[in-house]
Amino acid sequence: SGVEAAIKDEIEAFKLSLPAGYSLESDGEADTAAESQGQIISSAAIFFVLIVIGLVAALNSFKQAGIILSVAILCIGLSFVGLVIGQQNYGFIATVGAIGLAGLAINDSIVVLSHIKEEAEKNGLTKAKLVEVVIRSTRHVLTTSATTIGGFLPLLFASIFFRPLAWGMVVGVIGSSIIAVFYIPAMFIYLKKIQS
């Protein structure tokens, strides 16, 4: 926390001035928060590996799984942008929000990518058809994003404790919708040669 950082140097100087045989140890919320944050990040790494395996199995393509994973990484960055926009401090709750957003953000991208793949396998895919598929998918993307953002609005305005999580999630979900509609089709075109 900010208070802990402000007095840390003074505490270290005080430790050095203690007489022989005396020591000073700190404990409390800061240590517990650091331990909890370490546990959640190590758990997230395990689940990240499971997500990769699941995506490769579902999409049957390492490249397409890579596209979806890049969306997750971009959206984690967007959650930190949300903290800046909302003028919130980074902490344990913000970390939980960023990790949760990684899973939530890929949903819209999977919907768009699966619609594109379905159309490509059925009829072949031109750029004009790609635009039609993305426009059709946009309704699903906007609906899921609007309901998710609506669910976080009470936390955004009413809850001080969960406000960092809510800001990160709301900005991340808005960003993930934009990414799903523009980035996913662009990457699909990049990976597959599509006729004009």
Where are these regions (language model features)?
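Charged/polar, solvent-exposed surface patches and flexible loops
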Residues: 9, 13, 118, 132, ...
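Nucleotide phosphate-binding site architecture
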Residues: 33-34, 156, 188
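Membrane-interface catalytic loops of GT-C/OST-like multi-pass glycosylation enzymes that act
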Residues: 159-164
